[in-house]
């Protein structure tokens, strides 16, 4: 069945290419230009200080990996389970999802991350109907075959991923990052693509866009998600203009930045990549492709930023969190990576193009993910040791009883062996079957519930609650 579906997809893609060739002959070359990012106005060229409406004593961040609709469904299941996790914090009933202050997404994970940031908890159930249960991929192909779009594709400034962005714009209702900022109690949204020239992550954040002197508020969610989902060869890169020469020279004078210049190599590399964006003459444009090529977990840039900022304490203190405030820091990393479709080591035949792309994305990519996960484990131990040792200063943002909970949620940890093997072979596509959606949503909730780290968090929340929390907090069997 999988071969049949893949063959059908390739046939449709070939039909699209053939139709495009006819359009080229009939229409010549189109001059249409797609949306392009805007520069920051002169009066608004400083990074805004974000004021969260959530209780800063508990900070929750969620990262959703790439993997097409498979990752979106698995991540949706995790978010749904987080909403089911109810507890009382500082005398007020809440849920783990409502306490989430940061959501980060890559590729397929960015589709659901952006939807949640835009529509919140009340709008999240609609995502299942509007994306997961729809044949999004077929509608994308149908849209690509429309004569107007075929002619647009003859433009040297417009590629296949722009058609994906148009379809995603319908899903998000034309919303921009500025619209997300105006929604009450919105989480910070991080979407990661890959800078083709650097091979590193490019985040759609205020910090990143300030480097190129561009206004993130005007960026459509659809553009960011399409950039993060632009698988090389199958889809085209997306382009941003660098306006760094229109902003005052950005100088970093903090002691943390000075330490980063001579400290950990990851911090030095992070700062060097930052600096490369400030030269608009050498780098007037940035071309973006699938974020999974640089960081399929969507967590590496968060860690590198903390290192470059001088460490966890310094990073949080610089965003204005008062001393001795943070009691719980929770990071949930969701990984929906699958196995390669074919084990190329089992044959002496030359792998075909589909197998090569598959192996590069899910073989090499899996190795990079394992390295990131190991780095996360190491840095988590360092954070725990730092908390245990305490801070001699009176400006420490962590309370004396502060705890850090890092919770990995991997599709490979699905409890049922048969279901796990089947789900790990679900293709990376914009649409999967309704049965696969149901199983992946259930798997997301199940893996989170059975996670030892999650159970430890639940128990900790029970112990720190001022009075008995609602029954929904109890860890489910």
Descriptions of predicted regions:
Residues 16-27:
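Bacterial N-terminal signal peptides
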